[in-house]
C-alpha cells in the first residue's frame, strides 16, 4: 500500500506520543498494594518501591518521543498552513506553531525533571533513611522547576487544546457534521485528560492506572486529526501524494 511522506511524518509523531504514554506509565503507575500517599505537593511514597530501570526507560521514552513529536507536529503545521490561507485563519496556525514548538523544547525536559525528582527522593531515602527529609529535598527540586513547568503547560497543553477546539468549531478542519466535531473536541490534551482521564480514576485497579497516560494520548489524538486533514486534502488535490 502506498504511503505518503506526510502520512509517515504524522505517524512518526503518533509513535512519539505513544512513547510519552509508555514513559508516563513507567513513571506513575502503581501496583494494587502500593501506597497512594503523597508527601508534599509532588512526592509519592510509591516511588520508594519502584525499580530504578523504570525511571531510566521513562526518561529515554521522553527524549525519543520528543524528537518524533516534532516530526509529526511540524508536518501537521505545514498541512494547516497550506490548508488555511485566510488571514483570520493564519493566526490560529501561528498559535498552533507556538504550542508545538513549546512542546518540542520543553516536554523532554519536563519528563526528565519529574523522573529525576522521584529518583532524588528514592536515592536520598536509601542513603540516609529519612523519608521526610528526602521528600523535602525532592519537593524543593520541583518548586525550582515549577515556573518553566507551568509556562510549558499553558503554552503547549492549554494553547494547543484551545487552538484545536477553535479550528474544529470554526470549521477549519474538514469534519463533516456536528457529531464528528463533538468527537474531535475530545482530541486534545486538556479535554481528553479532564473528562476521559478522570473517568478512568473512578474505575478499579488496574483500569484506574490508564489515567496516567491520557495527557500524552491527547497529543496523539491531535495528530489523528492531522491524518483526517491529510486525507481530505489529498481528496481535494491540495497536496499531492509523495511516494518513496
Residue ranges and their predicted role:
Residues 1-243:
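Hydrophobic, aromatic-enriched alpha-helical segments typical of multi-pass transmembrane helices
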